[in-house]
Amino acid sequence: MAFLKKSLFLVLFLGLVSLSICEKEKRQNEEDEDENEAANHEEGSEEKRGLFDIVKKIAGHIAGSIGKKR
């Protein structure tokens, strides 16, 4: 009977340890995904700002050339 108790405790302990390791890896993966998502959002914002600057420069050149023609 004592042998069965020890075996059962060992199985439960190993199960809890493996479950704990899986949960830790899952949390790390979620944190990595959140960081990647934040980085992608920042890159998108920078691209939009860069595009806006280009459009603004082109509009300025067009307005300047129209003003010179008058």
Swiss-Prot record:
Propeptide position ranges: 23-49
Signal peptide residue numbers: 1-22
Tissue specificity comment: Expressed by the skin dorsal glands.
Alphabetic keyword roster: Amidation, Amphibian defense peptide, Antibiotic, Antimicrobial, Cleavage on pair of basic residues, Immunity, Innate immunity, Membrane, Secreted, Signal, Target cell membrane, Target membrane
Coiled-coil region(s): none
Residues recorded with modification Isoleucine amide: I66
Superkingdom classification of source: Eukaryota
Region (Disordered): 27-48
GO CC annotation: extracellular region; membrane; other organism cell membrane
Compartments where found: Secreted; Target cell membrane
Positions with biased composition (Basic and acidic residues): 38-48
GO-annotated biological processes: defense response to bacterium; innate immune response
InterPro entries: Aurein_antimicrobial_peptide, Frog_antimicrobial_propeptide, FSAP
The keyword Glycoprotein appears for this protein: no
Protein family membership: Belongs to the frog skin active peptide (FSAP) family. Aurein subfamily.
Function comment: Amphipathic alpha-helical antimicrobial peptide with weak to potent activity against Gram-positive bacteria, and no activity against Gram-negative bacteria. Probably acts by disturbing membrane functions with its amphipathic structure. Shows anticancer activity.
Protein name, UniProt field: Aurein-3.1
Organism: Ranoidea aurea
